[in-house]
Swiss-Prot record:
The gene is Nek2. It comes from Mus musculus (Mouse). The lineage of its organism: Eukaryota, Metazoa, Chordata, Craniata, Vertebrata. Residues 329-443 are annotated as: Necessary for interaction with MAD1L1. GO terms for cellular component: centrosome; ciliary basal body; condensed nuclear chromosome; cytoplasm; intercellular bridge; kinetochore; microtubule; midbody. The modification Phosphothreonine is found at T170, T175, T179. This is Serine/threonine-protein kinase Nek2. Residues 8-271 form the Protein kinase domain. SMART domains: S_TKc. ATP binds at I14, G15, T16, G17, S18, Y19, G20, R21, C22, K37.
Amino acid sequence: MPSRVEDYEVLHSIGTGSYGRCQKIRRKSDGKILVWKELDYGSMTEVEKQMLVSEVNLLRELKHPNIVSYYDRIIDRTNTTLYIVMEYCEGGDLASVISKGTKDRQYLEEEFVLRVMTQLTLALKECHRRSDGGHTVLHRDLKPANVFLDSKHNVKLGDFGLARILNHDTSFAKTFVGTPYYMSPEQMSCLSYNEKSDIWSLGCLLYELCALMPPFTAFNQKELAGKIREGRFRRIPYRYSDGLNDLITRMLNLKDYHRPSVEEILESPLIADLVAEEQRRNLERRGRRSGEPSKLPDSSPVLSELKLKERQLQDREQALRAREDILEQKERELCIRERLAEDKLARAESLMKNYSLLKEHRLLCLAGGPELDLPSSAMKKKVHFHGESKENTARSENSESYLAKSKCRDLKKRLHAAQLRAQALADIEKNYQLKSRQILGMR
């Protein structure tokens, strides 16, 4: 039996969608809180009616945890009003989240931005998939106001009023629709719209989540179109990682064939862990719905990915243990080197002490004046004649004078040599002091 308007209780109005009013309602049968979109199709043109039918059919076909769930539709032919009953997202939309961040002057956490990116990309993957008859769904109006959050801040993509189904034999849609701030360069140039146009809009949305403003702004649509075709925009705030900035920059590439696909985005290392977690949760939900335990088959690509992650973690643990062993070995080597340095320092101090004693001893010996070797000429045998004579007296005086002069010269030479040795010892002492400081520096 089809549902009636009387089966629901209107609680209050939430806002206005693309072509109608949204109201929060309660289903009387079980008290479940839902929302319906109230649309007056009597005032619509044939094109608008066609778009309305398209949205209803899409909502019935698209079933994904990150897409707003469709529950029912009610046709009031008397008042030419269509009610589309959908899931209620009590977390509001991303537009209100951005407005709050702008008002509070507080940026959103990168973890939240990455989670939004992951869940939105998974929703777009469901839309862009070429299965179930080869249909591809383009959202064509991806913006913060059309992305909703549930009570746990999970993303829900909604408002498919502008979406259009593409078949295999029709690769592009050419209708000029969408929100100007998020329109792609090909839309601004009146070119064909494809899956990569949704990727551009996703990049604009993620950019606005980070910067709290769109990447391209202008006072009129002509100026905005020029800026979008030029493709220049500022980097997202530096509080966000380079990886996130690079991925958003790739999404906002002027050439659509250079933009990443949904599969390439999901394969990014930046969100690989989040993707695996979302896929695991989705499988658990399916298991609960079917009443079977949520076991993954061995052939499941998700299980293979989880096993790969586990192996990678084990490899990282082994690498960390190996690094710990290396660090312990280095610590032992440092202890040995420290002991060797202490031994070298003790030997150096002992050598310095011995050299100091030797220096003092040698200086004392030089000051005492050891016996001097006389020259060979002074050692000639003297001729003695008995009795005193003038010759003998003169020779004796000359010998004494010669000996005194020779001794003086020899003493000067020895004093000079002692000074040279003292200087050499001082240099040696300085050298050992320097070596001692170097040894201490090794510690």
